[in-house]
Amino acid sequence: MADAGRSTRPHAVLFACGLNSVRSPMAAALFKHLFGRVSFVDSAGVRKGELDPFAVAAMEEIGLDIGKHRPITFEELEDLEGLNFDLVVTLAPEAHHRALDLTRRLPLDVEYWPTPDPTIAEGNREQRLDSYREVRDQLLTRIRRRFGAAPAVNE
């Protein structure tokens, strides 16, 4: 793992998971909140799912709104914007395999951050929401550890 800090912070990061409906939009929103003034971020999935209301609720608890996020696949993102990223952070095995396939034709780095799937949690609403909070908090910790402190306002 690279040392955290400005010198190792990529200019453009793509977070990817299976459906682009929970983990990758949460990670992208967290990254954007911390580094959006200095780095571009987006998210994609292997397939396109539906935005998960528990993910929206977990992010709202910390003041981040992902309610307008629209899940998108790698292919759709490439068709719309191109895949001009320095780094793809994959959060699920299928996304990791897809990102590694991209390295055959695109110059990008790929990091795999195994991240639990909170959608498989059982229990009442609060118990299920707790699993989304845990994923959110794990992603925030990992982003801070990997990319360093958020830049000062005057950077």
Language-model-detected regions and their locations in the chain:
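Short polar/charged helix/loop
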Residues: 1-155
